[in-house]
């Protein structure tokens, strides 16, 4: 199947299921220069043309200060789409270098928090009521496993959520799409992709989780689809439910 049609079909289903896009929306796409956000912009561009919904789209690229990440080609690629991409300069990397972890590496969680704050502020400054991120199905499953392994909880990110402090709604229209289909779509459209300049690139906990899951998929091919179905099957959740539901008591019981 044509990867563009496949990804766009996932996009439309996500919008139908979670009512992500409405008339009058002004949506800011968090642009990274990678395949996910670029394909998301393309899907929004097509959706605006062929759906009956009236909405505006802009792109926002938060420059973290890593350097060597050239976004100009990506901006130029989308110029015919009539979707402006704004660059927000920050000193986030300088801040991260002051808070290195025990292994002298930058902290991914702090980076994500600072980047999100810069993105939200920029989106509001440009009059946007929604922010669209390029997270896909594989990201959702990886997040689920990271939370289970490191946090002892069944949780992943939501396809749509209100950021209460800012009043901005965050949406993830590619949440049903698989990463390999997005990669095929980017290749077919010959999208210029900006290399990730993060010093931790390829050596993160998320990358380790991705590698573990890919190994699992080789041994159990059906698990990939089943994991996605699991995240949507909220009516069939069977976990322990102690009659004493005191939070502190629960934490004590799960301690080794």
Label each region the model flagged:
Residues 70, 104, 145, 149, ...:
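Alpha-helix boundary/capping detector
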Residues 57, 115, 138-218:
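Catalytic subdomain that performs nucleotidyl-dependent activation
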Residues 66, 92-94, 161, 177, ...:
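Residue-level detector of flexible, active-site-proximal loop/helix-junction positions
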Residues 1-142, 150, 180-188, 253-254:
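ATP-dependent adenylation/nucleotidyltransferase module used to activate substrates
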Residues 3, 7, 70, 178, ...:
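Alpha-helical structural motif
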Residues 191-256:
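The feature marks non-catalytic terminal segments
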